[in-house]
Amino acid sequence: MAAFPPGGTFFDTLKRSFTDVPVESGKIATTQFLEACESLTTLFDVLGSTAFKPVKSDMTGNIKKIRDRQLAAPVDSETLQDLVRNELATKKHTATEGLVWLNRALDFTAQALRQNLTNSGEEVSVSFRSAYGNTLSKHHSFMIKPIFSAAMSATPYRKDFYAKLGDDQARVEKELGVWLSSLENIVKILNDFLASKEAKW
């Protein structure tokens, strides 16, 4: 089954794109960010393997932790940075820790797709394995690594993956590039913020 409307691309199906997440003075809008993350998880359905279920489940679990905090204290959580600062001030860190793990997963996904988009002859599995080694692998236990390694090995062939994103490959690559640039910008902002003293517990 196609993951895109006739004449369109996968990116037309997203409820929220990272290109539509407001970022003002380096502050990231919480609601739109979470919607964009939820939309990103549908990419793992396009990858088509049940092996990616743990990856998707991990991301949706962390999205829920952040949203639960936002719903509990909406005024204090309009941006991700405000949410983190205000949660840590209460001596709790459930949502903050969720954001750390969610951002690692976003970084992994962004690096994998960027590497694959840049290297047109590379299979998707190679790009995802490389990105996993650069990102999530450093933080996963020996129990978790085999589960994620199985997902890397279960990715579709490159030609099949891109065909699932749209019929017009030039348009797919262009839209993927724009979407990725926005995602990478958000990941960089979060990497810097989460590494700062004010995001530590």
Swiss-Prot record:
Liamocins have high bioactivity against the pathogenic bacteria Streptococcus spp. and can be potential new specific inhibitors of oral streptococcal biofilms without affecting normal oral microflora. Liamocins are also able to inhibit human cancer cell lines such as breast cancer cell lines T47D and SK-BR3 or the cervical cancer cell line HeLa. One of its GO terms (molecular function) is ceramide 1-phosphate transfer activity. Keywords: Lipid transport, Lipid-binding, Transport. GO terms for cellular component: cytosol; membrane. It comes from the Eukaryota. It holds the Pfam family GLTP. Cargo transport protein that plays a key role in transport and secretion of liamocins, glycolipids (also called heavy oils) composed of a single mannitol or arabitol headgroup linked to either three, four or even six 3,5-dihydroxydecanoic ester tail-groups. This is Glycolipid transfer protein.
